[in-house]
Design a protein with these regions (language model features):
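Short C-terminal tail/terminal secondary-structure segment
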Residues: 14, 92, 103-118
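Active-site "substrate specificity/gating" loop of NAD(P)-dependent dehydrogenases
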Residues: 15-19, 24, 41-42, 60, ...
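Alpha-helical segment proximal to the catalytic Tyr-Lys
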Residues: 38-42, 100
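A conserved structural motif in NAD(P)-dependent oxidoreductases
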Residues: 76-87
Length: 118
């Protein structure tokens, strides 16, 4: 069957002060993922969503390295930012035949950020 993998953010799974438009948008992606999973499931199409946490990308490039290290140390179980390839590999894994019974999932790829915030 076909696969759809949307990209949201851990912000769609929780909330942070002063970025409500971003949080609302990412929560919307998660809702869309779940609705499409129900709608497209009968056609054999799985729809899932990756929710990345802190990643070394252009979006985080402007943050000072010591600030990033402190954030990761305090907030993630793995105490580091992810590399883009780690998120890409998890995204690809949802497209493999072995993920054929997985649908409607919002999967955190966040080094344990969401469990540390719980």
């Amino acid at each position: 069957g076909a696969r759809i993998v949307n990209i949201a953010s851990t912000e769609g799974l929780g909330a942070t002060r002063f970025i409500s438009p971003y949080t609302a948008a990412k929560t919307g992606v998660i809702g869309l993922t779940r609705s499409l999973a129900v709608e497209l499931g009968p056609e054999g199409i799985t729809v899932n969503c990756i929710c990345p946490g802190p990643i070394n990308t252009g979006m985080t490039q402007r943050i000072a390295p010591e600030q990033k290290a402190e954030f990761a140390r305090r907030r993630t179980a793995l105490r580091r930012y992810a590399e883009p390839e780690e998120v890409a590999h998890m995204t690809l894994s949802l497209c493999l035949p072995s993920a054929g019974y997985t649908t409607g999932v919002a999967l955190p790829v966040d080094g344990g950020l969401t469990i540390r915030n719980a």
